[in-house]
């Protein structure tokens, strides 16, 4: 497939679910066309908002996930709009969509129909439960996928209710898998001249993130949950400006525990000799009430007087697995991310201000990832894309009058 992604045209018909898949192609230089209805992508109505002011161009998730794309507005409920969409796909390499299974088929826009016009077309469908099976037609959300996949249960701790991780983790996992699957299918289409349908289900993508929960049940008959506060040597601890995460020992690994003891000794931590005892190698003791309270009493007396950055720097010197629990402000100031130029600031002419975005999720040797243009306004590039598709000016005007498409007025 080579390294020049600019040869690919991607039609992105996603909303709250799926936009990151197409964004990953946009970042590598592909021509990504974000297709939405004239009423606008539902993601435009999702906060948080730029300077806390809601608006169709002020949704921060929309601005991030659709940066690098061009905007095209079409009404698929309109017969002429469906023909326009079909024409658009006839010149595309990849269609990424997150429609309810059966919706496009009912409009005469099934993969079978679209691939008749373009045998090389790859269509990637990203849905909550996949395109087949008893749940395929059910409505779903990130929350329902996280619940059904087991992710919520695993995130909780014994004796407490399930816990939802922040943001839409099921969606993001599915989008990453969809990008990989799409790239593989594109590679195949370039070799064989024949595209294929890629079916990605959020519930399956998130089930891949359950660590060894399935093995616990298979091998030991146990339903695993989060560790919670069971071991002070492997949990969160408060410090002067927040929290740190510590893993001082795993299993019976004394070689992992010894550096932690040396750290406590070197710092002159009050009662540190309590840690210089092989009973801490015993998992049962570490997770006992005595082990937990003793560890937290001694260690947190030390951590509460120091910053998380200081604890991180000192702990790393002793080869102890300790790290700050970062908030958004910490991430923006993180020197590692700054060195790798992860944060990308770009002026948004619609909002009249600079906006800082997360940057490349990967680095290549010669292929440079790019943030690209600002996320499009509704119908911002409709006219120019129709011209590229071969529509003459009078026909474009007619489509606009009919309401089959919408174009931003200049």
Swiss-Prot record:
GO BP annotations listed: toluene catabolic process
Enzyme Commission number, as recorded: 2.8.3.15
Organism the protein comes from: Thauera aromatica
Keyword Repeat: no
Pathway involvement of the protein, from the record: Xenobiotic degradation; toluene degradation
InterPro entries registered for this protein in UniProt: CoA-transferase_III_domain, CoA-Trfase_fam_III, CoA-Trfase_III_dom3_sf, CoA-Trfase_III_dom_1_sf
Gene3D superfamilies xref list: Crotonobetainyl-coa:carnitine coa-transferase, domain 1 (3.40.50.10540), formyl-coa transferase, domain 3 (3.30.1540.10)
Function: Catalyzes the reversible conversion of (R)-2-benzylsuccinate to (R)-2-benzylsuccinyl-CoA. Inactive with (S)-benzylsuccinate.
Name of the molecule in the record: Succinyl-CoA:(R)-benzylsuccinate CoA-transferase subunit BbsE
Entry keywords, A to Z: Aromatic hydrocarbons catabolism, Transferase
MF (Gene Ontology): succinyl-CoA:(R)-benzylsuccinate CoA-transferase activity
Membership in a protein family: Belongs to the CoA-transferase III family.
Stated regulation of activity: Inhibited by (S)-benzylsuccinyl-CoA.
Protein induction: Induced by toluene.
Quaternary context: Heterotetramer composed of 2 BbsE subunits and 2 BbsF subunits.
Top EC class for this record: transferase
Record's catalysed reaction(s): (R)-2-benzylsuccinate + succinyl-CoA = (R)-2-benzylsuccinyl-CoA + succinate
